[in-house]
Amino acid sequence: MASNYNYEVRIQFKEKNPLLTEKFQLMVDYKKSKGNQDRFIFAPSSIVLKLKRSRKYKSILSNPQNSINTQIIKSIIAYYSVSSIYSQIKSIQINYIEGKNKTPLLESVTFQQPLQISIPIQNNLYFKKEIIQEITTESEKGECIRIALSYWLKAQITDDLYVGFENLWRAFNRLYVYYGKQSNENTNLCEIRKFIIANAHHFPQTIKITNSYLEQELLHSFRWQKLILNDYPTQKHTQALIDFIHRYTDKRIMKLLQEKLVCREDNIKSLGKWNDIQNYLNSNKNTSSDIELVTLLCIKYAYFLRNKFFHGEILNGTFKLTKDHIDLEFEKLNKLLSMLIFELVNNNILP
């Protein structure tokens, strides 16, 4: 069916994005577009969409399945992703165009802010402009990135560590499920771990964060013994624990395992493997593998916390009278996860 109906959407922001010094435009597909494309025009403080459709719509913003609605959301995610400042949306105007006449859709007068902010927020992590092409592409990868960034952006504006962690984990979850393409969660996590290690050179800023940890900080800022007891709770899990140990070689990880494995010493000894494990740890006492520390914290440890948190096994993180070591733990993990997701997307290395 021919696209006979013209629409124009104008989104105005309260503040200018200093990184967008001039207008640029893209031709963007939409679902079931059959080769038709919309024009996205990005400017420092605005987005303009020019669209053609095969019917006249009475409602757009209130219909999440409407292709114009999805294009609006797509453009806003792209705009915020390449912004060095998160600004409120000042206005949204949707016009139906017939000849030289513009008829405004009244529903666009009222809308909610996708990012719930009352004042502009400076953002130090902004994606390169070229990534907009990936964000707006109508493909499995494009959809994955948009979903991930919708959560990642929410995490950037919250002061609540636990809300931040939830959003960051959901963003990371979407990326590793897309990459792993398996129904099993652990399989997908194993696949993204291998991918990150194989592409270590793409994660310099994430590695910089983990490399800044002093030995005692790494040992005592995280609950390693609780992780070991939780993930390997009985004798029958001992071989899995041994396999876990052998996946790592970095000297810092060897050091913390030497200190924390005592909680499962009897189980390991029952298999006659204690001396072998000690020899393995000692043989790697001078080995460096920076990316392993990233995967240990962002995948193994964060997944342990995620399960405790999402399954309601621990108190709500904010139900307390003063800040404690668990808050500091989430603070560190949020910083790490945020950077890992940023580098995964910004370097455009996912296939």
List each model region and its residues.
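Charged, non-catalytic interaction/linker regions at domain boundaries
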Residues: 1-163, 323-347
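Amphipathic, oligomerization/interface secondary-structure segments
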Residues: 136-328, 344-351
